[in-house]
């Protein structure tokens, strides 16, 4: 297959993915004797197109599964998408609002039709993006969290947990979005620091003897106060415990109670209790059997319990209430106060802690089982390991999980209420006398269905499902560390509860993709990057390699166009190296022609040794998910060892008349390049397929090729030392040429004083490499080389490299040139010194700019010292 002179990612990638999918290369093996390897894709939300975080996440999964497929595993990489309840519903509602329509205008059934249309549209976008990224997914098994099979699993889990008493219906404080009018999970609440106020009010004692000071950031909630609490150990209030105060404006009498929850040192040490509008107050209220008074409705407006403030927006009520309290001389002070306020991730509304009747999952026993499992052989391994502590900490401090949502898009709760008796029926099927029952209108939290993802996608609850029996538990979960609590932990406890097994063996956690300056990517900052735009510019392979190798497990990744471009340059280097190799291998060279048992040269032995070392390193690091280190190992071997050194060295035999040596070189080129393509393939699937198809090969595709194996017979340890000596000599000569301003094209005499006779023999046997790379007019290698008076001498491992200067350069002219260069460097040093000693510059300039000037100074100083040393050497 022809390789064009220039690497063009568009040409290389065009049609390739469709060919892979059409030929079924990503389907699991039909050989059931193979060990399985499974990853189920973390399902992206059907709310929109994929971002860089998704690209990073799925690239890592694809690298792992491609590698395992090549290593002979029966590999399944299963695709799917999440209905993303509130997020998708918000998008669909926004679209309807543009037409002046609400979901209530349409009704539930028609609205859900609109939501399904949205899902189909965005699912096709997501599939197209998966294709552009080159993900090796088995589309015949694609799942969706609302499809029939998963709905069956969701109903079974809900009913089973209800029957076990783990799911219950009750009153709790939940996160309430008054704009979307639904409960929110903790992950759907974004906390932001907001400039607010701390209001200090007087609550007069009922006996008229003074007042108690109360501070709050939410004055509107005081209308629902039912008690004041103080710490029983607080000497200031020991005498008032049991007394009562009058709730300002309302006139209700509130008891003063003792509770150790109160922080003696915070504020006045006395705290108002509003059980219906604060989670901590609710717990206090439960302990003291306080009344729950809800003073707002679901829209965030004050209700009839708020008296004269009924109908007002909560924030308007706050202003009016403070004004009224001032008029009654009940305001002590108002302090500016920055505090963390929860906002709905979807609507942006300030979240209201709100007492509501919801469905909950009782978490204590489920969490305990998850923690206990981490002490067994069936434990889940976290990469990095430190995140296991994060997981354990959360499980130890877990609260019951609110699972009901006041939405239409999602799994409707399988609970029905009898129209006359109010009896609750929970079942996988509706009651037979359905006309007497009303189904709960709420849907389940999106995380409830996605918590079942590893096993519901494989056919559970059908325990006889072939996929479930063969591919569960899965092998690895790759996801962001930001959803350990909300997804990873829930999959673990649901997997253990319903399958008695961990849902995955390993959890590989990565960070967030950030902008180059370290800030979070966001629409408001305008610093987001569309991965598809990057692919259009540089190709999928460039983006994939950057994402995979640009960070280490558990750390954030800073996106950099410059670094993506450097990967593109790396691929160009590979492309050019492959083209040279293929031109020398020749079209008639076949796999069976590869013979590595012949008379291998030093360069052949060295590159084969380095190849085997790289295979071992890449395999070992990949097993530990250290893809950043893998990237460095591959880059160093391919760019430096293979392209810069071996390819150049291979020109010696290829330009000779020795046909036997040419054939050996062709074998080494072909074998090495083939193994490079195989190692690179999981990272760069498109370009490696293109090059591999042009190489002598067996099989239809590199996707199904075997992973490279270390061959002990092709490791020649002694070749590394000899090559190291030669490379050091070559680099030394080249550096000396630069220093005396003599181009490589000009032949010069070179003397090498070998450290001992053994080195002298080794260098003499391999002098062809020195002749090719150093271009000497004469080359003298000996232990007793006489060093001329005027010469440049470099000390190397093998001895000394000497360049006689007599006749090579005009000494006076060269000294004059170097002195002018020294003067220029001195002037640059003076300029930078002046800048860095300027207090005005140092105090006002950004740190980045200051560091850049310091770097320049260091560079100039190093150059200055080098030029000065050369002048002294020439004058000596």
Curated annotation (Swiss-Prot):
Keywords for this protein: Aminoacyl-tRNA synthetase, ATP-binding, Coiled coil, Cytoplasm, Ligase, Nucleotide-binding, Protein biosynthesis
Motif ('KMSKS' region): 520-524
GO cellular component terms given for this protein: cytosol
Location in the cell: Cytoplasm
Catalytic activity: tRNA(Val) + L-valine + ATP = L-valyl-tRNA(Val) + AMP + diphosphate
One Pfam family it belongs to: tRNA-synt_1
Record's keyword annotation contains NADP: no
Residues binding ATP: 523
EC number: 6.1.1.9
Residue interval(s) of motif 'HIGH' region: 44-54
Coiled coil residues, start to end: 805-876
GO molecular function: aminoacyl-tRNA deacylase activity; ATP binding; valine-tRNA ligase activity
Enzyme kind, highest EC tier: ligase
BP terms from Gene Ontology: valyl-tRNA aminoacylation
InterPro entries on file: aa-tRNA-synth_I_CS (IPR001412), aa-tRNA-synth_Ia (IPR002300), Anticodon_Ia_Val (IPR033705), M/V/L/I-tRNA-synth_anticd-bd (IPR013155), Rossmann-like_a/b/a_fold (IPR014729), tRNA-bd_arm (IPR010978), tRNAsynth_Ia_anticodon-bd (IPR009080), Val-tRNA_synth_C_sf (IPR037118)
Similarity section: Belongs to the class-I aminoacyl-tRNA synthetase family. ValS type 1 subfamily.
Notes concerning its domains: ValRS has two distinct active sites: one for aminoacylation and one for editing. The misactivated threonine is translocated from the active site to the editing site.
Assembly information from the UniProt record: Monomer.
Protein task: Catalyzes the attachment of valine to tRNA(Val). As ValRS can inadvertently accommodate and process structurally similar amino acids such as threonine, to avoid such errors, it has a 'posttransfer' editing activity that hydrolyzes mischarged Thr-tRNA(Val) in a tRNA-dependent manner.
Protein name from the UniProt record: Valine--tRNA ligase
Organism name: Staphylococcus aureus (strain NCTC 8325 / PS 47)
């Amino acid at each position: 297959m022809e390789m064009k002179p220039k690497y063009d990612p568009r040409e290389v990638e065009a049609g390739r993915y469709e060919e892979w999918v059409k030929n079924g290369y990503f389907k699991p093996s039909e050989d059931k004797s193979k060990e399985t390897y499974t990853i189920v894709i973390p399902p992206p939300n059907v709310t929109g197109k994929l971002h860089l975080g998704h690209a990073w996440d799925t690239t890592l999964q694809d690298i792992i599964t491609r590698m395992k497929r090549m290593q002979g595993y029966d590999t399944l990489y299963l695709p799917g998408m999440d209905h993303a309840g509130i997020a998708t519903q918000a998008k669909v509602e926004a679209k309807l609002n543009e037409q002046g329509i609400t979901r209530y205008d349409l009704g539930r059934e028609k609205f859900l039709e609109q939501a399904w249309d949205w899902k189909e549209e965005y699912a096709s976008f997501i599939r197209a993006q998966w294709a552009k990224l080159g993900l090796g997914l088995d589309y015949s098994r694609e799942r969706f969290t609302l499809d029939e099979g998963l709905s069956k699993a969701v109903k079974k889990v809900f009913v089973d947990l209800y029957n076990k008493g783990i799911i219950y219906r009750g009153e709790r404080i939940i996160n309430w979005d008054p704009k979307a009018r639904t409960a929110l999970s903790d992950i759907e609440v974004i906390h932001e620091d907001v400039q607010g106020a701390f209001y200090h009010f007087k609550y007069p004692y009922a006996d008229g003897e003074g007042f108690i000071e109360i501070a709050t950031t939410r004055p509107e909630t005081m209308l629902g106060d039912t008690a004041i609490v103080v710490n029983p150990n607080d000497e200031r209030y020991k005498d008032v415990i049991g007394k009562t105060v009058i709730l300002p404006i309302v006139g209700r009498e509130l008891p003063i109670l003792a509770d150790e929850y109160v922080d003696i040192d915070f504020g006045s040490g006395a705290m108002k209790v509003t059980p219906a509008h604060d989670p901590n107050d609710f717990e206090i209220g439960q302990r003291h059997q306080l009344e729950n008074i809800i003073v707002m409705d679901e829209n965030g407006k004050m209700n009839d319990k708020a008296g004269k403030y009924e109908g007002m927006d909560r924030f308007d009520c706050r202003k009016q209430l403070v004004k009224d309290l001032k008029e009654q001389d009940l305001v002590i002070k108002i302090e500016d106060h920055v505090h963390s306020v929860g906002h709905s991730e979807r609507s942006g509304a300030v979240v209201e802690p709100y007492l509501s009747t919801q469905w909950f999952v009782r978490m204590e026993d489920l969490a305990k089982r998850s923690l206990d499992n981490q002490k067994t052989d069936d434990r889940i391994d976290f990469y990095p390991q430190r995140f296991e502590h994060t997981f354990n900490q959360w499980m130890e401090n877990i609260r019951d999980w609110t699972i009901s949502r006041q939405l239409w898009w999602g799994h409707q709760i399988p609970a029905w209420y009898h129209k006359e008796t109010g009896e609750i029926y929970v079942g996988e099927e509706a009651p037979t006398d359905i006309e007497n029952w009303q189904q709960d209108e709420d849907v389940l939290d999106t995380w409830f269905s996605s918590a079942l993802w590893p096993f519901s996608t494989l056919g559970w609850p059908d325990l006889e499902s072939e996929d479930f029996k063969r591919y569960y538990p899965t092998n690895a979960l790759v996801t962001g560390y930001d959803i350990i609590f909300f997804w990873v932990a829930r999959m673990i406890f649901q997997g253990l509860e319903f399958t008695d097994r961990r849902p995955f063996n390993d959890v590989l956690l990565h960070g967030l993709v950030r902008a180059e300056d370290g800030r979070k990517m966001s629409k408001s900052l305008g610093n987001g990057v569309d991965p598809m735009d990057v692919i259009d510019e540089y190709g999928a392979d460039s983006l994939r390699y950057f994402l995979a190798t640009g960070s280490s497990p558990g750390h954030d990744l800073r996106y950099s166009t410059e670094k993506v471009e450097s990967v593109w340059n790396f691929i160009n280097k590979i492309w050019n190296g492959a083209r040279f190799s293929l031109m020398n291998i020749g079209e008639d060279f076949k796999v069976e022609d590869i013979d590595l048992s012949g008379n291998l040269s030093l360069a052949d032995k060295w590159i084969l040794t380095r190849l085997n070392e790289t295979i071992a390193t890449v395999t070992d690091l990949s097993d530990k998910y250290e893809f950043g280190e893998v990237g460095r190992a591959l880059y160093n071997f391919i760019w430096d060892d293979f392209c810069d050194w071996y390819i150049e060295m291979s020109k010696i035999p290829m330009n000779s008349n020795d046909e036997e040596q040419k054939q050996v070189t062709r074998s080494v080129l072909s074998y090495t390049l083939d193994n490079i393509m195989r190692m690179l393939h999981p990272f760069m699937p498109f370009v490696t397929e293109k090059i591999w198809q042009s190489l002598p090969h067996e099989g239809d595709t590199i996707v199904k090729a075997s992973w490279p194996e270390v061959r002990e017979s092709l490791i020649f340890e002694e070749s590394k030392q000899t090559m190291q000596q030669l490379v050091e000599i070559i680099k030394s000569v080249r550096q000396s040429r630069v220093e005396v301003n003599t181009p490589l094209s000009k032949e010069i005499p070179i003397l090498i004083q070998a450290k001992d006779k053994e080195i002298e023999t080794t260098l003499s046997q391999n002098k062809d490499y020195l002749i090719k790379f150093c271009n000497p007019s004469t080359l003298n290698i000996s232990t007793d080389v006489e060093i001329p008076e005027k010469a440049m001498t470099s000390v190397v491992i093998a001895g000394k490299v000497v360049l006689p200067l007599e006749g090579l350069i005009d000494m006076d002219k060269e000294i004059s040139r170097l002195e002018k260069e020294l003067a220029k460097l001195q002037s640059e040093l003076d300029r930078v010194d002046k800048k860095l000693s300027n207090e005005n510059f140092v105090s006002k300039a950004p740190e980045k700019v200051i560091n850049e000037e310091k770097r320049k100074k260091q560079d100039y100083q190093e150059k200055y010292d080098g030029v000065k040393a050369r002048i002294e050497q020439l004058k000596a």
